[in-house]
Regions:
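Hydrophobic h-region of N-terminal signal peptides that target proteins for export
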Residues: 10-19
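A generic structural signal for short, solvent-exposed coil/turn residues
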Residues: 11, 33-34, 50-52, 62, ...
Length: 127
């Protein structure tokens, strides 16, 4: 099977999340959740929903019950909650070690290449 690089775009928080979600700190959503075992990859259909929180953290909201967090192995200069993420994916979906660039909305100029870490699921604890 030949692996050809593909590009995936992930719009920033302002374009994808409901207003109530945009108005609060995304990291506060981890309160009351328990971290699961890290995984290397997400399904391809989840990549478009990855959201930058700061220069080291991406999140994906799978459902009201499960949120995925990706702590990048290094700081990604220029990455923030208004970034458009452009991924270079080899295979089915974003995986640990895959690279991406952050593009400032309106500028079109990509930032430096950054790498993904492992994806950690956080599941809401049932009362």
């Amino acid at each position: 099977m030949s692996l050809r690089p593909g590009l995936l775009l992930a719009a920033g928080l302002a374009a994808t999340a409901p207003a109530a979600t945009r108005d609060r700190d995304p990291l506060s959503e981890f309160t009351g959740r328990v971290a699961g075992a890290p995984v290397r990859c997400l399904n391809a259909d989840r990549a478009g929903s990855l959201q930058a929180v700061d220069d080291r953290t991406l999140i994906y909201r799978e459902s009201s019950r499960r949120i995925w967090r990706n702590d990048l192995p290094d700081v990604c200069p220029g990455l923030d909650d208004d970034s458009i993420l452009v991924f270079e994916v080899f295979g089915g979906g974003p995986c640990k070690g895959d690279t991406f660039r952050a593009v400032r909305r309106g500028s079109g100029i990509p930032g430096p290449m950054c790498r993904l870490g492992s994806f950690v699921p956080y599941v809401k604890v049932k009362p």
